[in-house]
Amino acid sequence: MSTLKSHPTTTLSSEMKDTAAHQWLLNFHTAGDSLNPEPWVTTFFSPDCEMRFPGQPILKGHREIIAFFKRQFTNLDSMKHTIRRFDTLPDRIYQEATISYVVRADPEKEPIDIPGIAIFGKGVGEERMSFFTVYLDPSPLHTKIRSVSAALAP
């Protein structure tokens, strides 16, 4: 079994590195899917983390990232991430996932499934990421939010 230098003070096998990354991703998504941004962001994002999300300016730091997710989560009843695959490098994790959203006040509770790719700027042994970049097309979710809002309008 080969070993990779994945952190300045930690040498792990590829299998151990992937297991640690997978567990971190599961913990990250469980916390995020709770739709409670404060503990999620402060636990998994470094205080100076930069987040790039489609259609948004670069968000910097806990305050901006929490504010973004608070706005987004007000439109949701639920969010569930399913990891499809991931790859680890010494300083980042690449992940493919499907995110299933249910829009708040949708009488049908129809899940909106959106595939996406994310890059997490963290090394093995690091608990918080320094950057988070998301690639996905949120337009099906935005369309559903608009249609539910229009149906509720007097």
List the model feature ranges, each with a label:
Residues 1-2, 61:
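Low-complexity proline/serine/threonine-rich segments in eukaryotic and viral proteins
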